[in-house]
């Protein structure tokens, strides 16, 4: 008697296989960078055949898109909820800085590979991050700028101070703690206001 076909089970197995490949790729991108990771590396890490990786992701663009989304879904949450209970401008700025530093620490394994940042899929994610950061800056500064009209220079300088590269350069010094980095950035932003 022929075995019955279960399309739901098949679909589940396909999704699990795809997820396994994405997770292997995300880990390799953190270890080696996007441009140094081959489909052969991915197949070995995922414990699948190389053609299986190509079948699931015929082009690197689709794989990179899946990986950036996978990593982004697990990133620390950046929402206006971080300001709950924060009444002073300094408290709000400190909450924003703390959140941004957590995000930078989370994404550092991938972003440290500078050449990878020129890829369209990564650029798209970074643009989304800038938009989100701008929203949070506006929310943080709301007590000081009730109209929501923050001076352009203040917004630009705040974006610069909250940028991954600022965090990474301070982190690279190695002699200051995460808490000190957060204090430095918070103080710098508060002096601009």
Question: Could you tell me what each predicted segment is?
Answer:
Residues 139, 155-176, 191-193:
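Amphipathic C-terminal alpha-helical segment
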Residues 98, 102, 106-109, 120-156, ...:
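Amphipathic alpha-helical packing segments from all-alpha helical-bundle domains
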Residues 66, 79-106:
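Hydrophobic alpha-helical connector segments
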Residues 1-15:
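N-terminal intrinsically disordered/low-complexity leader segments
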């Amino acid at each position: 008697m022929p075995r019955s076909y279960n399309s739901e089970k098949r679909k589940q197995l396909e999704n699990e296989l795809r997820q396994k490949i994405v997770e292997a790729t995300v880990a390799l991108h953190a270890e080696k960078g996007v441009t140094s990771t081959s489909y052969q590396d991915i197949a070995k890490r995922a414990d699948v055949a190389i053609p299986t990786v190509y079948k699931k992701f015929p082009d690197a663009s689709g794989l990179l898109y899946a990986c950036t989304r996978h990593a982004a879904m697990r990133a620390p949450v950046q929402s206006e909820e971080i300001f709950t209970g924060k009444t002073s401008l300094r408290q709000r700025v400190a909450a924003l800085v703390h959140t941004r530093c957590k995000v930078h620490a989370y994404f550092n394994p991938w972003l440290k590979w500078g050449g990878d940042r020129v890829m369209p899929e990564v650029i798209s994610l970074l643009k989304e991050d800038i938009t989100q950061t701008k929203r949070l800056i506006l929310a943080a500064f709301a007590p000081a700028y009730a109209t929501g009209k923050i001076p352009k220079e203040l917004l630009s300088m705040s974006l610069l101070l909250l940028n991954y590269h600022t965090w990474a350069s301070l982190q690279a010094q190695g002699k200051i703690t995460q808490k000190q980095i957060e204090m430095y950035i918070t103080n710098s932003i508060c002096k601009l206001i």
